[in-house]
UniProtKB/Swiss-Prot annotation:
Family: Belongs to the universal ribosomal protein uS2 family.
Ranges for region Disordered: 258-278
InterPro entries: Ribosomal_uS2, Ribosomal_uS2_CS, Ribosomal_uS2_euk, Ribosomal_uS2_euk/arc, Ribosomal_uS2_flav_dom_sf
Role this protein plays: Required for the assembly and/or stability of the 40S ribosomal subunit. Required for the processing of the 20S rRNA-precursor to mature 18S rRNA in a late step of the maturation of 40S ribosomal subunits.
Subunit comment: Component of the small ribosomal subunit. Mature ribosomes consist of a small (40S) and a large (60S) subunit. The 40S subunit contains about 33 different proteins and 1 molecule of RNA (18S). The 60S subunit contains about 49 different proteins and 3 molecules of RNA (28S, 5.8S and 5S). Interacts with rps-21.
Gene: rps-0
Broad class of where this protein is predominantly found: cytoplasm
List of residues that carry N-acetylserine: S2
Protein name as catalogued: Small ribosomal subunit protein uS2
Keyword terms, alphabetized: Acetylation, Cytoplasm, Ribonucleoprotein, Ribosomal protein
Keyword Cytoplasm: yes
Amino acid sequence: MSSGAAHSALTEEDVMKLLATQAHLGSTNLNFQMQQYVYKRRFDGPNIINVKKTWEKLLLAARAIAAVENPADVVVVSARPYAQRALLKFAAHTGATAIFGRFSPGCLTNQIQKTFKEPRLLVISDPRIDHQAVTEASYVGVPVISFVNTESPLKLIDIGVPCNNKGERSIGLMWWMLAREILILRGKISRQTGFVLDGKEIMPDLYFYRDPTETEKEETGAHAEVAETQEFQQQPDIDFTAQGGKVEDWAAETATWTNEGKTAADEWATGAQTQSNW
């Protein structure tokens, strides 16, 4: 094995990340073109993807993207909501051009449109959902790289990276790993230092999808905690160590407590005893 192949070999840490996010679990359906990437079929239906072949295709896709001189000529598209955050981070870290949400028909073919683009490479999350972008790319001769599941068609796809492209965390991890490999090939980071940009370590969960309702609840809870802390800090401080007046003779001080300490129950008992004597 050459030193370059050993340097880019799949590490145990990356394997654990793929397994933890279930990136190796495909769908129950199987396309005949994807059969070469399937390791075996699980007893309850899902097809298990060979993570070694996933890694090989991921490296091939990273080399193709890194070969483009201008990073802005790489257009990334995904209509899947789970991949929107990953697309934003991928474009910010690699310099690619991102198209969020719905892909407008004619974006690659109609020059009159304001959103018209002439990319050199197109990267998508799912060939089924992003079929419009794949079709237009074939019209203008733009190569297409896609994350593909076991049921995904490989027609018009130049490089398919087999993985679970439907999971919230798995698709985020795949975009994170692709961005990391691209930056390694460009020489901006190294495998020894890890995915570190501007002194900050980029973790995979930064690419994960976050539910807006859950994020709003977390922000509301944080504001409530801050308000409670400020209210507690505004309360006056009580000095429990302050000393009271000094008492010289406790016997003299407590002599007057006898009559003052009578309760209503004592008075009632005395009255009842007087009535019985009467």
